[in-house]
């Protein structure tokens, strides 16, 4: 996909496309480093856009992994289908990310190991934001590794993600614009799924 087409989609759908340009290599590497690719994983990506993070995930992931790409923009979804048409591990889903549990079931999948997202949560209405977080949480496998990974201009989502007991965040300056890379873990290290106070006290 050309930079011109990506720019055009940003202008047409600024509430759905997080940035005016694709992510930098530094940001892509920081996000990919949050995954454990040592075994087959089920991964869902929200808003892959032109696929810059997607390509790095595919390059690193175990050969028996599966990747579900949720892209609401029809033109970007068509681009992804064309680009990844020869890889049977990848499914492109042109629907709202809140349909994650339903789509997992329709693909014969019980849980995800990871959900990764670059969609701009800060522009979402609060009710929709919290519903999506609930759907993500219920779709993640019940273990201490499973996580929701985001890269965002702001870190305001931490205030809404009270379902996740453990949170780790870092700031990437080597991107335009700079981004927070934040990981929300399904369970605390002691195996509990909710710490009861919602303050995400696992930051490091």
Regions found by a protein language model. Name each.
Residues 3-38:
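Class I SAM-dependent methyltransferase Rossmann-like catalytic core
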Residues 142-151:
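Conserved beta-strand signature within the Rossmann-like core of class I S-adenosyl-L-methionine
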Residues 40-49:
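Conserved class I S-adenosyl-L-methionine
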Residues 171-204:
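Core SAM-dependent methyltransferase catalytic element
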Residues 51-55:
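Glycine-rich SAM-binding Motif I of class I
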Residues 66-71:
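Conserved SAM-binding motif I beta-strand of class I
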Residues 130-142:
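A short glycine-rich, Lys/Arg-flanked "PGG" loop and its adjoining helix->strand segment in the class I
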Residues 76-106:
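S-adenosyl-L-methionine
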């Amino acid at each position: 996909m050309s930079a011109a087409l990506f720019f055009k989609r940003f202008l047409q759908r600024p509430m759905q496309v997080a940035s005016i340009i694709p992510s930098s290599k530094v940001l892509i590497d920081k996000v990919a480093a949050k995954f454990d690719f040592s075994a087959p994983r089920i991964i869902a990506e929200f808003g892959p856009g032109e696929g810059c993070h997607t390509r790095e995930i595919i390059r690193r992931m175990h050969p028996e992994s599966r990747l579900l790409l949720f892209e609401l923009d029809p033109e970007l979804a068509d681009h992804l289908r064309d680009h990844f048409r020869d890889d049977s591990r990848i499914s492109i889903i042109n629907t709202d990310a809140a349909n994650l549990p339903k789509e997992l079931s329709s693909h014969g999948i019980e849980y995800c190991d990871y959900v990764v997202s670059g969609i701009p949560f800060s522009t979402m209405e609060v009710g929709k934001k919290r519903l999506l977080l609930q759907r993500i949480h219920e779709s993640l496998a019940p273990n201490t590794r499973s996580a929701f990974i985001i890269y965002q201009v702001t870190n305001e989502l931490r205030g809404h993600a009270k379902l996740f007991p453990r949170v780790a965040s870092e700031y990437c300056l080597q991107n335009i614009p700079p981004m927070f890379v934040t990981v929300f873990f399904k369970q605390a290290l002691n195996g509990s799924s909710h710490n009861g106070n919602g303050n995400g006290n696992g930051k490091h």
